[in-house]
């Protein structure tokens, strides 16, 4: 069977299924005729033999062959139908539900990232989408610096958030946008108390510049578009007050998430980030001195799955709608301890003011355990005496 390259993948699958079912039907007819002829010839030979001693055995054999013949005539269609249905379900699962590792070459999807490429997490996210064959547009304040090397990178383009010409060209070149990733600065060092000017500059360059750019993009969206907001919320959830910049950033992202949920043209989700690790070093929350989750498994693949679920086949979109309870549950947790800190009293375990880190907690639990064991040992020795 020759595959037609111009047909849609769904048409090719149904053509393949029709071809397979038709060939299976022809083959089953030939097998049925051959079995019937064999049974008739064997029955004829048995009936022609005049052996009184084996007359009872011959009658039993003829009954068995007759039963097999009737069974083949009645149930061959059922078996063929079950086989064809199983094959269609398997092909449907591989086509509509199972995600390929990369975007198929025939598909072209555009992702817009609002963030600074100097941040290691943002830079790794951009390169992961690029490796998965997405066309990536990056809206960053340092666009002029990266545009000098734009010719050396296919499918990666840069937009200056303050340049109207860049946005005009973007609206012309990109008629359909798959997803928007709102990524403020995600990797911080302990900031402590900083001046108002430094805090204002940091918040403006990390959030408000991209917030203004997003407001200018929303009126040009022709359909409901996915918006994923990244929130460095671990510091705020742990009540670490000496990380003021990160806490304020997390609070602003929470507020913007609630605001954008009211927009009809946006399908908004937020990702609360835990500890992520690039290579052998943690890339964020370094003050906790803990190993993080691998960024490829903990962040890159979930983001890729979210994009494909919102822009894939209708069955995949339906499955995503069911798993998120109709879009009601739109908060995702990526990275180590990201979901754990949402539990009550989780901050007491990590908070420096209570002087309870994981190592100290483990040491205290070990002491309590040893004291309990020693108590029971003493009581047992006294009872034996």
UniProtKB/Swiss-Prot annotation:
Top-rank lineage group of the source organism: Eukaryota
- Segments spanning the bilayer are none
Q: What gene does the UniProt entry assign to this protein?
A: YSC83
**Which GO CC terms are listed, alphabetically?**
mitochondrial outer membrane; mitochondrion
**Name of the featured protein:** UPF0744 protein YSC83
Main localisation: mitochondrion
Give the family per the record: Belongs to the UPF0744 family.
InterPro entries, sorted: DUF1776_fun
UniProt topology in membrane: Peripheral membrane protein
Q: Where in the cell is it found?
A: Mitochondrion outer membrane
- Keywords carried by this UniProt record: Membrane, Mitochondrion, Mitochondrion outer membrane
Cited Pfam families = DUF1776
């Amino acid at each position: 069977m020759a595959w037609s390259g111009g047909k849609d993948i769904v048409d090719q699958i149904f053509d393949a299924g029709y071809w397979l079912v038709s060939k299976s039907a022809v083959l089953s007819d030939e097998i049925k005729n051959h079995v019937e002829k064999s049974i008739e010839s064997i029955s004829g030979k048995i009936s022609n033999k005049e052996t009184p001693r084996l007359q009872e055995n011959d009658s039993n054999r003829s009954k068995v062959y007759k039963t097999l013949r009737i069974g083949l005539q009645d149930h061959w269609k059922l078996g063929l139908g079950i086989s064809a249905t199983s094959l269609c379900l398997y092909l449907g699962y591989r086509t509509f539900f199972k995600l390929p590792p990369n975007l198929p070459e025939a598909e072209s999807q555009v992702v817009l990232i609002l963030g600074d490429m100097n941040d290691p997490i943002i830079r790794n996210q951009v390169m992961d989408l690029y490796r998965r064959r997405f066309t990536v547009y990056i809206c960053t304040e340092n666009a002029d610096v990266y545009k000098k090397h734009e010719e050396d990178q296919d499918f990666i383009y840069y937009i200056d958030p303050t340049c109207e010409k860049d946005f005009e060209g973007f609206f012309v070149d990109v008629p359909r946008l798959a997803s928007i990733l709102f990524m403020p600065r995600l990797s911080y060092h302990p900031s402590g108390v900083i001046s108002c000017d430094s805090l204002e500059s940091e918040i403006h360059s990390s959030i408000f510049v991209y917030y203004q750019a997003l407001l200018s993009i929303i009126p040009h969206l022709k359909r409901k578009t996915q918006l994923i907001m990244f929130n460095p919320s671990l510091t705020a959830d742990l009540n670490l007050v000496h990380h003021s910049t990160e806490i304020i950033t997390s609070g602003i992202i929470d507020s913007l998430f609630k605001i954008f949920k009211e927009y009809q043209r946006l399908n908004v989700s937020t990702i609360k980030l835990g500890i992520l690790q690039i290579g052998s070093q943690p890339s964020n929350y370094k003050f906790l001195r803990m190993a993080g989750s691998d960024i490829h498994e903990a962040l890159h693949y979930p983001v890729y799955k979210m994009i494909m679920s919102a822009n894939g086949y209708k069955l995949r979109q339906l499955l995503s709608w069911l798993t998120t309870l109709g879009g009601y549950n739109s908060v995702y947790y990526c990275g180590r301890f990201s979901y754990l800190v949402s539990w009550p009293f989780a901050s007491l375990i990590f908070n420096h003011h209570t002087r309870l880190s994981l190592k100290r907690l483990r040491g205290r639990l070990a002491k309590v355990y040893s004291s309990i064991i020693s108590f029971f040992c003493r009581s047992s020795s006294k009872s034996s005496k």
